[in-house]
A protein has these predicted regions:
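Glycoside hydrolase catalytic-domain groove-lining segments
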Residues: 79-103
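Loop/helix patches that line or flank the sugar-binding groove of alpha-linked glycan CAZymes
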Residues: 32-38, 46, 51-54, 89-93, ...
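Short low-complexity stretches enriched in small and charged residues
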Residues: 63-72, 97-103, 130-131
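Short, contiguous acidic/charged loop-to-helix segments that flank catalytic cores in large enzymes
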Residues: 15, 78-82, 122-123
Length: 204
């Protein structure tokens, strides 16, 4: 299948996304003819538009009115033990989207992506377990950003790579095992594109 980055931003001066929706409907028609088993996943954040446009799935994301960040990425996340966070606005937005799209496709809540701080930046191990119980049991298809399943860290202070800036800290190499290079590469560390997280606590 195909994951489409910024799928809702293709047509300028298209506030209701009519042109963008029509474009994706054409692509979906082609895909169904040539690759009928393929799936289309959009980074759009407006399921009522993306699913009509032909996508099988759409992400609720950290931008727009979803209140996704209230769950995991704010000063007081809902899944934090301090119990000061609220999921009220997220639930309202989710239910509204679900009512408009039920039967048309799937709304997906990702654990994160390459543009967000990692889950483990704001949640400890126990909080992560509860967050994943939520992510894996909600309607839709679960999407887990590589490494979130083992609690990989947001590594502060990394040198920006290709305009990644703060996002670079969420893009460190996957830690496959507890070997010196975490099973990611046989290259010397100074040759890594982005530095490995040296704390390695997610292997324990």
């Amino acid at each position: 299948g195909f994951r489409v980055d910024m799928a809702g931003s293709l047509v300028k001066n298209d506030p209701e996304s009519k042109g963008t929706i029509a474009l994706w409907q054409n692509i979906r028609e082609f895909l169904d003819e040539e690759f009928p088993d393929a799936a289309m996943v959009s980074e759009w954040g407006e399921p009522d538009k993306s699913l009509i446009g032909g996508f099988h799935m759409d992400f609720l994301l950290h931008f727009g009115p979803s209140h996704y960040n209230d769950l995991f990425r704010c000063d007081h996340p809902y899944f934090s033990k301090d119990a000061e966070g609220s999921a009220k606005e997220f639930v309202a937005a989710y239910q509204a989207n679900y009512a408009k799209t039920d039967g048309k496709g799937l709304i997906c809540i990702p654990s994160g992506n390459h543009d967000m701080d990692r889950l483990a930046k704001n949640l400890d191990t126990d909080e992560l377990k509860v967050a994943f119980a939520f992510l894996l049991s909600m309607p839709g298809a679960p999407f887990i950003y590589y490494g979130d399943e083992i609690g990989m860290h947001y590594v502060e202070g990394l040198t920006s790579v290709e305009g990644g800036y703060g996002r670079t800290s969420s893009r460190t190499p996957m830690q496959w095992d507890d070997s010196l290079s975490a099973g990611f590469s046989a290259a010397r560390k100074d040759k890594y594109y982005i530095a490995l997280d040296e704390s390695r606590t997610c292997q324990r």
